[in-house]
Amino acid sequence: MMIALVGLIGCSCGNGTGTKGITGAYSKAGKLSEEEKAIFSEVVSPYVEPELKAEKVSRQVFAGTNYCFVCKDPDGKRVEVVVYVPLPGNGGPDITSVNGEELMDDFPGNSLVFITPLGKPLRVACIFHGSLAFEYDGKVIHIDPVTQMGEMKIDYSAFGKADAIFITHAHHDHLCPEAINALSDEKTVLFANAESVSALSKGMVLVNGDSGELSEGIRYTAVPAYNTTEGREIFHSKGNGNGYIFDFDGFRIYVAGDTEPIDEMSELGSIDLAFLPVNQPYTMTVSQCVEAAELIHPKTLIPYHYSDTDLLGLPEMLKGMEVKIIESLR
């Protein structure tokens, strides 16, 4: 699991609330042992931004151990991260809660966690290529779920059902009936562009500019996504596909869909996290990704849908902007 913590608030682990089936009180918080320092370094430090300093730890033991690390972020704010370490032979350690909010067991791995302005954790799963998922306030949203890309395969039946699924456009690497069916039950709402709804014979059509509220505190807006370079317009024509902006209690994520830099990007407003496609000739070149990022100015940029594109120089080209390159999003 990858974790990125932003705008954190304090809470308390020592209230007898457990995770992974563990109940009972935590021990009194004290200094970290060498073993606990190693756990923190292995499970938390590589995946947490901003960098956290663990000051104390308390424990809760039963069929494994919960370690509640009491930390400080660079601004001096208190942050609590719970790591569950199972008994030998029962899997590896994992982060199970942040600031008292438990993370779902049946949510895809390879995820990051951001904290919204209300102090709630927002989990972002980087599944592969253009497939993403969000978990917030008990709701799960999937974007362009696809079961297979080349040798990469995902069994979506292993995950919990989605509350909503958003499809950007009807290309095979974004629209997959098998994945949609695996994630859906009678409560799942499907949103897509008109071509995808026609292909699936189900779903609610969203056109550029449409917006709505999925639940209290979760809003969505469909935004333009299209090619502009001469000769590429055939791949993604203007007005056909969508990008999406998701607003989670003020934390705004931009999922660009398949697009090149377009004028509309300058009108998106404040963006905390942006997913931009880098896969020429269908979407952006690396230099176009830089151009788009400079139009949007996200706090964090994650290139996705990038296939074999070499992204190693991208962070250097966007100094002052946090750039995360995630292998699964090829």
Residue ranges and their predicted role:
Residues 1-8:
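Bacterial N-terminal signal peptides
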Residues 154-212:
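Active-site HxH/HxHxD metal-binding segment of metal-dependent hydrolases
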Residues 114-119, 131-170, 177-181, 229-234, ...:
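Pre-active-site segment of Zn-dependent metallo-hydrolases
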Residues 13-114:
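N- and C-terminal low-complexity/disordered segments
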Residues 202-216, 290, 294-330:
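Binuclear metal-ion centers of metallo-dependent hydrolases, dominated by the metallo-beta-lactamase
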Residues 114-120, 127, 192-251, 324-330:
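Metallo-beta-lactamase
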Residues 228-295:
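Active-site-proximal loop/helix segments of hydrolase catalytic cores
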Residues 142-146, 162-173, 190-194, 254-257, ...:
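Active-site neighborhood of phospho(di)ester-bond hydrolases with catalytic His/Asp-centered motifs
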